[in-house]
Amino acid sequence: MVVIALGFLVGALAYPFIPGHAIDQMRGARAQIAFSLPLTTLIIYLLFRSLWRHDRVRSGNGAFEATYHAIIFRTMVFVFGMHALLMLALTDVMDVVGTHTWGKRVVVVMLGLAIMAIGNLLPRTRPNIAFGVRTARTLTNPQLWQKVHRVGGYLTVALGAIILVAGIVITNNAAAGLVLLLVVLAVAIMFFTYRRYASA
């Protein structure tokens, strides 16, 4: 909840300084810009909290709760970081800290860090309805779930690390293409990994 409150606080502080004549002419546009991402963070929190309460698949699996909430928290921190960066870019603060020059790279680096942070937790997950490779087999076979998500965790951390480095050393357009290619490759590897373990 602290992350959510901070997001709304940052939006409220930046609200009067968000510029643009088009924004002034569009009723509610300034509020949408200032509070859309904090609202998204709140929705993420409420949605996954509801899924946890109504998840019958993970019944009796209390050890997974800390990992579940850690993944949600890291996702929320990423959204908050994006929001804070956006507010910096849209207000006069950008002239002080120079977000025009490094802002886009920071977005890619933040994405890489978030993917690594979440991927590091995937091997600790257990069958649930919220996230992961959710098929009839993985949801009913904890051993299969663990095998698939162990590989998925390694892949996700590696993907995040490459994205992080790409954000630092590669141009923005090239980084976007590389990220897309790596995501497709990771999904393909996960598909064949699942098929391999499921048919074993």
Where are these regions (language model features)?
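Alpha-helical transmembrane segments of multi-pass membrane proteins
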Residues: I4-H21, I44-S50
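Alpha-helical transmembrane segments and their membrane-interface junctions
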Residues: G11-A12, G81-T99, A158-A175
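Conserved phosphate-binding loops in nucleotide/dinucleotide-binding enzymes
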Residues: P19-T40, T135-Y154
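Alpha-helical transmembrane segments
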Residues: M26-L42, H100-I118
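Membrane-water interface of transmembrane alpha-helices
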Residues: L42-R56, A117-V133, T193-S199
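Ordered, amphipathic secondary-structure segments that act as subunit-interaction surfaces
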Residues: L47-T101
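Cytosolic, membrane-interface loops and tails of multi-pass inner-membrane proteins
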Residues: D55-A63, R126-L144, V148
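Terminal transmembrane helical module of multi-pass membrane proteins
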Residues: T135-S199
